[in-house]
A protein has these predicted regions:
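Short, surface-exposed, charged amphipathic helix/loop patches that serve as local interaction elements
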Residues: 8-10, 17-94
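Extended acidic low-complexity intrinsically disordered regions
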Residues: 1-11
Length: 94
């Protein structure tokens, strides 16, 4: 069961891919609104937007400069991380 304090304080989630550590930021209400907008206007960019918006290095700096940069991320990275990000949008609803 997720820690409700971590959810409400938007503490990032520690993550790792191919030995590289990074963080996944929890979504805010503004992120939810923007995610709906992105999915409505350009669904082909939705996965890249998720990576761009939520992936950060261990110092909290974005891993990707923009959505176009995130679109160039390795497919294996996106396949692992995007479902983790999507799950955060439903975190705590139970």
């Amino acid at each position: 069961m997720p820690d409700i304090r971590a959810i409400l304080s938007l503490q990032p989630i520690a993550a790792e891919w191919n030995g590289c550590r990074f963080q996944i930021s929890r979504p805010t209400l503004a992120d939810l609104v923007e995610a709906v907008d992105v999915n409505t206007k350009s669904p082909e960019n939705a996965r890249a937007w998720c990576l761009y918006r939520h992936c950060q290095d261990t110092d909290g700096k974005p891993l990707f400069a923009d959505v176009a940069d995130a679109m160039a991320a390795p497919a294996g990275f996106a396949a692992k991380v995007v479902p983790q990000i999507e799950a955060l949008y439903n975190e705590g609803v139970d």
